[in-house]
Amino acid sequence: MATSAVPSDNLPTYKLVVVGDGGVGKSALTIQFFQKIFVPDYDPTIEDSYLKHTEIDNQWAILDVLDTAGQEEFSAMREQYMRTGDGFLIVYSVTDKASFEHVDRFHQLILRVKDRESFPMILVANKVDLMHLRKITREQGKEMATKHNIPYIETSAKDPPLNVDKAFHDLVRVIRQQIPEKSQKKKKKTKWRGDRATGTHKLQCVIL
């Protein structure tokens, strides 16, 4: 693995938001990405954010990832986070038909909050390791992604993980393509939660 020094300053920061129904594995994906461990059970009422220095395509960046709660009662809070997000991973479980059907709702909400006709997003079909429980096919997932003109990726947070790093990195690549100025200058830091107590921020450095 190649090694290089992490630039000390002027790194672009990408605020990535992980959204989707409760129980689809948002926290498992996020924790696998940052800590390289699989956590099967996680408190769904907790919103948490993580920081990570990462080199993607020979460009260093800081990823500030927010793992949102999936419950409906958190929808107003989630909308607040969406206003500051640079890109979104819309996650559903291939074992949960309802979570797949709700992809439309999340996509529409993001565009409404952003007041845009398009915005950097990736559709993430999670829990593909549970083949015996799968209800949503790859073809259905791809059709949904094509409908919304966003990339599609299948993931599993269970060890050995599948496409977890790639999902987050691909979203950064989409942001760089659609919002090129993001890769050129350091973004002013903003809080995810306003005055609300924040979750644990973990700062890591990786080279990929």
Curated annotation (Swiss-Prot):
Annotated source species: Homo sapiens (Human)
Tissue: Expression highly restricted to the brain and heart.
Top-level division of the source organism's lineage: Eukaryota
Any one Gene Ontology cellular component term annotated for this protein: protein phosphatase type 1 complex
Protein name per its UniProtKB record: Ras-related protein M-Ras
PROSITE patterns, A to Z: RAS (PS51421)
Binding locations of Mg(2+): 27, 45, 67
Modified residues (Cysteine methyl ester): 205
Cofactor binding note of this UniProt entry: Binds 1 magnesium ion per subunit.
Function: Signal transducer in the Ras-MAPK signaling pathway that regulates cell proliferation and survival. Core component of the SHOC2-MRAS-PP1c (SMP) holophosphatase complex that regulates the MAPK pathway activation. The formation of the SMP complex only occurs when MRAS is GTP-bound. MRAS has low intrinsic GTPase activity and may require additional factors for activation. The SMP complex specifically dephosphorylates the inhibitory phosphorylation at 'Ser-259' of RAF1 kinase, 'Ser-365' of BRAF kinase and 'Ser-214' of ARAF kinase, stimulating their kinase activities.
Motif stretch (Effector region): 42-50
Membrane topology: Lipid-anchor
Residues reported in the UniProt entry to bind GTP: 21-28, 38-40, 42, 44-45, 70, 126-127, 129, 156-158
Chain's gene name: MRAS
